[in-house]
């Protein structure tokens, strides 16, 4: 992000401060449990996600966790890909900007999830019989152009700027929406945004950003 002051996503994330402090039907807000504001209390949290959450028996990204944790604690629904979920996700992630990504890749649940995420990455699907790997690994389509679109290299890491502002869409997208958008040209049905398959795929991709600083929200075409 060459000029974060010229990123509409930053303004959108900052507006989430209101949601952070607003009490839900249960009479509590995020701020009631996380004192000091999001910038202080959430510092270093986002770089550990996606991760396996034992309480829920699955891998979760920040967006997944908010979907369940928000209603449980505040009584306020925060559905994944909803505006408030996305804004709060950006707010939480911005608190860790500059902190190196450090997702777990060594525990037994993480290793199992990474194996499943890798299988999804290499699985051929849809009318075109393509896999994610066909476009996003350096020995295949990565670092080339397809239909005017540059195909990024997953093994070089491209998750640490999500959610990102899409100038072509005039909107912020999280990683799940990017996954769903990618499935359209493959001629296959997209999964629901909160699917475990997407969460494990996101973990698999995020491991390639381990050690690199978080930079949210990104800005891309």
Residues covered by each model-derived region:
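Electron-transfer interface patches adjacent to heme c in soluble/periplasmic c-type cytochromes
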Residues: 1-9, 22-32, 40-86, 94-98, ...
């Amino acid at each position: 992000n060459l000029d974060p002051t010229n990123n509409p996503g930053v303004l959108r994330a900052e507006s989430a401060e209101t949601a952070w402090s607003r009490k839900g039907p249960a009479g509590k807000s995020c701020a009631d449990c996380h004192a000091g504001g999001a910038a202080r209390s959430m510092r270093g949290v986002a770089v550990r996600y996606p991760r396996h959450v034992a309480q829920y028996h699955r891998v979760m990204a920040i967006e997944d966790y908010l979907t369940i944790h928000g209603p449980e604690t505040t009584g306020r629904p925060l559905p994944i890909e909803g505006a408030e979920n996305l804004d709060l996700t950006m707010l939480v992630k911005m608190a860790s900007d500059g902190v190196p990504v450090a997702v777990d890749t060594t525990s037994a649940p993480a290793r199992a999830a990474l194996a499943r995420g890798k299988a999804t990455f290499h699985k051929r699907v849809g009318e075109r019989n393509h896999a994610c790997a066909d476009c996003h690994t350096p020995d295949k389509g990565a670092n080339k152009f397809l239909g005017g679109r540059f195909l990024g290299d997953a093994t070089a890491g491209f998750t640490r700027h999500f959610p990102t502002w899409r100038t072509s869409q005039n909107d912020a997208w999280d990683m799940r929406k990017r996954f769903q958008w990618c499935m359209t040209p493959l001629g296959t049905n997209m999964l629901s945004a909160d699917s475990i398959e997407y969460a494990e795929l996101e973990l698999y991709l995020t491991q390639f950003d381990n050690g690199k600083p978080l930079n949210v929200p990104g800005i891309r075409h």
